[in-house]
Design a protein with these regions (language model features):
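Cleaved targeting-peptide boundary
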Residues: 20-28
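Structural motif
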Residues: 26, 49, 121-123
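Bacterial N-terminal signal peptides that target proteins for export
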Residues: 1-7
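Short aromatic-glycine motifs in intrinsically disordered, low-complexity regions
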Residues: 72-78, 125-132
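N-terminal signal peptide c-region/cleavage motif recognized by signal peptidases
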Residues: 9, 15-17
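Central antiparallel beta-sheet cores of small beta-barrel/beta-sandwich binding domains
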Residues: 29-113
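Edge beta-strand at a domain terminus
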Residues: 121-123, 130-145
């Protein structure tokens, strides 16, 4: 009886954590070339859509500590990158989050986007692409909260 109770409790915890696995939270992005932290992005959910806003940039002392998006177009042109919403429109589609858009502040381009969590919920693979996701690039973000 005691063993059955332990198994049931473990199953309930596993089920609850699986149901709670969403991209909402604080994520650390990693520089592809150096492996160093690059930024912190806060992902929030509003009306079934996830969006991500840059909360902090990790910059070296010789870099501009408050860079602006000089390559962005429209309303984002020359706006501070810190505080900028770069990920929009992600919606849950089964185990994946799809139909989003992601802005690369380095080149000012907006790409289609999708994302998926690993089994632990501690890593988020974010893919930006043009047209078909085959033609794109992925980054792994690490949960920071």
């Amino acid at each position: 009886m005691k063993r059955l109770l332990i198994v049931a409790a473990a199953a309930a915890l596993a089920s609850a954590s699986a149901m709670a696995a969403t991209p909402a939270g604080l994520w650390k992005t990693i520089d592809d070339n150096t492996g160093s932290p690059r930024s912190l992005i806060r992902i929030t959910q509003v009306n079934g859509e996830y969006k991500g806003t840059i909360e902090k940039l990790f910059r070296t002392p010789d870099q501009d500590q408050n860079p602006k998006c000089d390559k962005c177009e429209g309303a984002l042109k020359d706006k501070p990158i810190t505080g900028m919403t770069i990920l929009t429109g992600l919606r849950q589609d089964g185990d994946e989050f799809a139909d989003g858009k992601i802005l690369d502040p380095e080149n000012g381009k907006v790409y289609s986007s999708k994302a998926s969590l690993d089994g632990s919920g501690k890593k988020l693979e974010v893919r930006g692409f043009i047209g078909v996701s085959l033609f794109g690039r992925s980054q792994t973000w690490v949960r920071a909260d």
